[in-house]
């Protein structure tokens, strides 16, 4: 005779989230004999059952909902299994006291407290946990929205420059149409990213493949030509002809180059120079360096500039400080398994370095670089 207490749960998760270690361990445990409950687990995908999000007021997934026994509880985040493990013994104890017919009355030692107060304490604890999870999720979504919004500026700026160039007779109408078409495709991809904000991690939106960093940097330099030519800034490149291809998301790598080269132009003096270097330091990494001879960054600020929501004060020339762009660069590079840093001296200039994994065939190890 099975005397296990029944436990009804609903797991709300996107398809790609089901492959995370936390969710795999959760499902395996609930299906195993080690679980002290007779568990009924319903797995639902939010795209197929969006009404669950509203019904249970979910703003974060994956989420595990305890439907019965009452009261309802919700666990969300990247550590659902560990959260559940903390509560299982308590639920088991609650079930035991009920099955034995024990009437939980206030004790003589603490006669001023009622059973309702204890239940309220439990509910308050659950609410605090949910609030903490929701706060983290909201912060994550805000960060992602800022990044996507920042990326959206790139194709819009490129399209605007193309229109201006066509008006000045620098490009013909067919070239303008080609540029506009390509930028609209980029905007379409970004809009898809925005739709995925609530259901997946930003890292999961990456599409790593075999790409040529030399070509990407050349495209970005050409795209920003109007900005560096008008200020008579010289851009030199040192890219070996035998530089290997890398394993990265082409659109995201382009964003890194655009942000860093745009910053280098922005902080360079008129008639200044920028140097872009790429070297194959090891069998696994390509290191890219972008140097300018601008105002430089104080040592105390060199780590902070890569953080979210950090903007340095204006320089003496009145140029606005680094904004969200460097935070975007950091996250993109880290998702690829690389690192980014700056070497700078006030009054001399700055060199931004970052590494990207070499293409060695699309094996599992490299695919895992993009899984946060």
UniProtKB/Swiss-Prot annotation:
InterPro entries named in the record: HATPase_C_sf, His_kinase_dom, HisK_dim/P_dom, HisK_dim/P_sf, KaiB_domain, Kinase_SasA, Light-responsive_reg, Sig_transdc_His_kin-like_C
EC numbers for this chain? 2.7.13.3
User: Which SMART domains does the record associate with it?
Assistant: HATPase_c, HisKA, KaiB
Q: SUPFAM superfamilies from the entry? A: ATPase domain of HSP90 chaperone/DNA topoisomerase II/histidine kinase, Homodimeric domain of signal transducing histidine kinase, Thioredoxin-like
Q: How does it assemble?
A: Homooligomerizes. Interacts with KaiC. Participates in the KaiBC complex, whose core is composed of a KaiC homohexamer and 6 KaiB.
Domains (record comment): The N-terminus interacts with KaiC, while the C-terminal histidine kinase domain autophosphorylates and is probably responsible for self-oligomerization. The N-terminal domain stimulates the C-terminus to autophosphorylate.
Q: Which Gene3D superfamilies match?
A: 1.10.287.130, Glutaredoxin (3.40.30.10), Histidine kinase-like ATPase, C-terminal domain (3.30.565.10)
Q: Which GO terms describe its biological process?
A: circadian rhythm; osmosensory signaling via phosphorelay pathway
> Any idea what job this protein has?
Member of the two-component regulatory system SasA/RpaA involved in genome-wide circadian gene expression. One of several clock output pathways. Participates in the Kai clock protein complex, the main circadian regulator in cyanobacteria, via its interaction with KaiC. KaiC enhances the autophosphorylation activity of SasA, which then transfers its phosphate group to RpaA to activate it. In addition to its output function, recruits fold-shifted KaiB (KaiB(fs)) to KaiC to cooperatively form the KaiB(6):KaiC(6) complex (independent of SasA kinase activity).
UniProt organism field: Prochlorococcus marinus (strain AS9601)
Can you give the residue ranges of the Histidine kinase domain? 147-360
Reaction it catalyzes: ATP + protein L-histidine = ADP + protein N-phospho-L-histidine
PROSITE patterns with a match to the protein in the record: HIS_KIN
Query: What protein is this chain from?
Result: Adaptive-response sensory kinase SasA
**PTM sites of type Phosphohistidine:** 150
Could you tell me which Pfam families the record lists for this protein?
HATPase_c, HisKA, KaiB
Single GO MF descriptor: phosphorelay sensor kinase activity
Q: What keywords tag this UniProt record?
A: ATP-binding, Biological rhythms, Kinase, Nucleotide-binding, Phosphoprotein, Transferase, Two-component regulatory system
């Amino acid at each position: 005779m099975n005397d296990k207490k029944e436990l009804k749960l609903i797991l709300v998760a996107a398809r790609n989230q089901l492959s995370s270690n936390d969710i795999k361990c959760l499902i395996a445990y609930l299906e195993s004999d080690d679980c002290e409950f007779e568990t009924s687990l319903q797995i639902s995908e939010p795209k197929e059952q969006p009404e669950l999000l509203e019904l249970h007021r979910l703003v974060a997934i994956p989420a595990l909902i305890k439907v019965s026994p009452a009261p309802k509880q919700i666990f969300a985040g990247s550590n659902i299994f560990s959260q559940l493990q903390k509560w299982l013994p308590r639920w088991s104890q609650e079930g035991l006291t009920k099955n034995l017919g024990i009437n939980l009355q206030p004790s003589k030692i603490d006669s001023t407290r009622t059973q309702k107060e204890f239940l309220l304490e439990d509910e308050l604890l659950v609410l605090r946990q949910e609030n903490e999870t929701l706060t983290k999720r909201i912060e994550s979504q805000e960060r992602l929205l800022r990044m996507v919004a920042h990326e959206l500026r790139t194709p819009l700026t490129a399209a605007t420059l193309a229109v201006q160039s066509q008006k000045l007779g620098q490009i013909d109408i067919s070239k303008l149409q080609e540029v506009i078409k390509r930028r609209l495709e980029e905007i379409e991809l970004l809009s898809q990213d925005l739709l995925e904000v609530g259901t997946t991690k930003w890292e999961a939106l990456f599409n790593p493949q075999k790409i040529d960093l030399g070509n990407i940097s050349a495209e970005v330099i050409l795209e920003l030509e109007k900005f560096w030519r008008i200020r008579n800034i010289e851009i030199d490149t040192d890219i070996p002809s035998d530089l290997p291809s890398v394993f990265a998301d082409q659109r995201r790598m382009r964003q890194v180059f655009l942000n860093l080269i745009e910053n280098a132009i922005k902080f360079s003096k008129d008639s200044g120079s920028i140097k872009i270097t790429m070297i194959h330091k090891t069998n696994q990494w390509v290191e890219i360096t972008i140097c300018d001879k601008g105002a430089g960054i104080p040592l105390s600020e060199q780590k902070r500039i890569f953080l979210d929501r950090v903007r340095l004060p204006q320089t003496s020339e009145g140029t606005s400080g680094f904004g969200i762009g460097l935070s975007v660069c950091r996250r993109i590079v880290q998702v690829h398994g690389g690192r980014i840093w700056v070497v700078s001296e006030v009054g001399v200039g700055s060199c931004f370095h970052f590494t990207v994994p070499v293409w060695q065939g699309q094996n599992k190890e490299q695919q895992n670089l993009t899984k946060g």
